[in-house]
């Protein structure tokens, strides 16, 4: 069974963990509606970069009725 030659220092441990920090998600505001959404995701209204890209189910039901 392998045994380490010497113990790692707290400094080395910290340097190893330096990339493990969590960051807040980046949020954007839609150009048309002003709604806040995640970057590179559509809004709840179905807008992406100021353009309507998907219809909501309510809109589809109104068309079918």
UniProtKB/Swiss-Prot annotation:
**What GO CC annotations are associated with the protein?**
large ribosomal subunit
Concerning InterPro entries, the annotation shows:
Ribosomal_bL32 (IPR002677), Ribosomal_bL32_bact (IPR044957), Ribosomal_zn-bd (IPR011332)
List, in alphabetical order, the Gene Ontology terms for molecular function in this entry: structural constituent of ribosome
Q: Which Pfam families match?
A: Ribosomal_L32p
Biased amino acid composition, Basic residues: 1-19
Region: Disordered; residue ranges are 1-32
The GO biological-process annotations, alphabetized, read as: translation
Please verify whether the record's keywords include Iron.
no
Name the coiled-coil region(s): none
The entry's keywords: Ribonucleoprotein, Ribosomal protein
Asked whether the keyword Membrane is assigned, the reply is no
Check the UniProt entry and state the signal peptide residues, or none. none
Question: PANTHER family of this UniProt entry?
Answer: 50S RIBOSOMAL PROTEIN L32 (PTHR35534), LARGE RIBOSOMAL SUBUNIT PROTEIN BL32 (PTHR35534:SF1)
Q: Which NCBIfam families does the annotation name?
A: rpmF_bact
The family this protein is said to belong to = Belongs to the bacterial ribosomal protein bL32 family.
Protein name listed in UniProt: Large ribosomal subunit protein bL32
Q: Which organism is it from?
A: Ruthia magnifica subsp. Calyptogena magnifica
Tell me the classification of the organism that encodes this protein.
Bacteria, Pseudomonadati, Pseudomonadota, Gammaproteobacteria, Candidatus Pseudothioglobaceae
What gene codes for this chain?
rpmF
């Amino acid at each position: 069974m392998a045994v380490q030659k010497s113990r790692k220092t707290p400094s080395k441990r910290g340097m190893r963990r330096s990339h493990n920090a969590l960051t807040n998600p980046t949020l954007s505001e839609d150009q048309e509606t002003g709604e806040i959404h995640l970057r590179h995701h559509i809004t709840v209204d179905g807008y992406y970069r100021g353009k309507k890209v998907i219809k909501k189910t309510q809109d589809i039901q109104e068309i079918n009725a």
